[in-house]
UniProtKB/Swiss-Prot annotation:
It comes from Homo sapiens (Human). This is C-X-C motif chemokine 13. Keywords: Chemotaxis, Cytokine, Disulfide bond, Inflammatory response, Secreted, Signal. One of its GO terms (molecular function) is heparin binding. The lineage of its organism: Eukaryota, Metazoa, Chordata, Craniata, Vertebrata. Highest levels in liver, followed by spleen, lymph node, appendix and stomach. Low levels in salivary gland, mammary gland and fetal spleen.
Length: 109
């Protein structure tokens, strides 16, 4: 009797785990790669509206870089392209550097 109740409890526990995983997958809107084809052709900075970096995850085994151009076209860029690596390094340095905060000193009477 103890064995049957234990096995039933175990089966109930295992069957309840799959919906939890499904709830967590809601946060991943698409569980596949967004870029079908990647380009390594240089895009001048003046034509770029924004850049989105998608790290590798459950749905896609590779890192993806998506560039939105000002003419509303979207280009998937090869993350190994030298020009995009240099551009990302420049952007990282800009975002990590902080402007000095002005210090106002009060004169104590």
């Amino acid at each position: 009797m103890k064995f049957i109740s234990t096995s039933l409890l175990l089966m109930l526990l295992v069957s309840s785990l799959s919906p939890v995983q499904g709830v967590l997958e809601v946060y991943y809107t698409s569980l596949r790669c967004r870029c079908v084809q990647e380009s390594s052709v240089f895009i001048p900075r003046r034509f770029i509206d924004r850049i989105q970096i998608l790290p590798r995850g459950n749905g896609c085994p590779r890192k993806e870089i998506i560039v939105w151009k000002k003419n509303k076209s979207i280009v998937c860029v090869d993350p190994q392209a030298e020009w995009i690596q240099r551009m990302m390094e420049v952007l990282r340095k800009r975002s990590s550097s902080t402007l000095p905060v002005p210090v106002f000193k009060r004169k104590i009477p």
